[in-house]
């Protein structure tokens, strides 16, 4: 199977989905011990790269997304689909899986 090259800027989420660049996980503990990849926890914070057009309502109209590109968000630990593009980690989430916008 051939590898497909996808540019992050071409990803357009559908509906109420958002595409989030995952923040890097901690490399070492507070005590200075380096963590191997298998011991690192999955980050739950990231920056929104693209936002879908919004959820479609019963009457056919769309609800405006509550988040925007550039927002730093906290999301559910097991939410979304993990995607790796260009050596970077991303997650495709439904807007309902976002718990908070972080300042």
Curated annotation (Swiss-Prot):
Complex formation: Heptamer of 7 subunits arranged in a ring. Interacts with the chaperonin GroEL.
Keywords: Chaperone, Cytoplasm
InterPro entries in the cross-refs: Chaperonin_GroES, Chaperonin_GroES_sf, Chaprnonin_Cpn10_CS, GroES-like_sf
Cellular localization per UniProt: Cytoplasm
SMART domains to which the protein is assigned, alphabetical: Cpn10 (SM00883)
Coiled-coil regions listed in the entry: none
Gene3D superfamilies, A to Z: GroES chaperonin (2.30.33.40)
Primary residence: cytoplasm
Name this polypeptide is given: Co-chaperonin GroES
Signal peptide start and end residues: none
Stated family: Belongs to the GroES chaperonin family.
Recorded GO CC terms: cytoplasm
A Pfam family annotated for this UniProt entry: Cpn10
Organism: Rippkaea orientalis (strain PCC 8801 / RF-1)
Task of the protein: Together with the chaperonin GroEL, plays an essential role in assisting protein folding. The GroEL-GroES system forms a nano-cage that allows encapsulation of the non-native substrate proteins and provides a physical environment optimized to promote and accelerate protein folding. GroES binds to the apical surface of the GroEL ring, thereby capping the opening of the GroEL channel.
One BP term from GO: chaperone cofactor-dependent protein refolding
Keyword hit for Cytoplasm: yes
Gene Ontology molecular-function annotations: ATP binding; metal ion binding; protein folding chaperone; protein-folding chaperone binding; unfolded protein binding
């Amino acid at each position: 199977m051939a590898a497909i090259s996808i540019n992050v800027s071409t990803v357009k989420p559908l509906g109420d989905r958002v595409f989030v660049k995952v923040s890097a996980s901690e490399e070492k503990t507070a005590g200075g011990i380096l963590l191997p990849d298998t011991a690192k926890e999955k980050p739950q914070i990231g920056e929104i790269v693209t936002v879908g057009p919004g959820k479609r309502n019963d009457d056919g109209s769309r609800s405006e997304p509550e988040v925007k590109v550039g927002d730093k968000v906290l999301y559910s630990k097991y939410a979304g689909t993990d995607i790796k593009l260009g050596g970077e980690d991303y997650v495709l989430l439904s807007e309902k899986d976002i718990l908070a916008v972080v300042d």
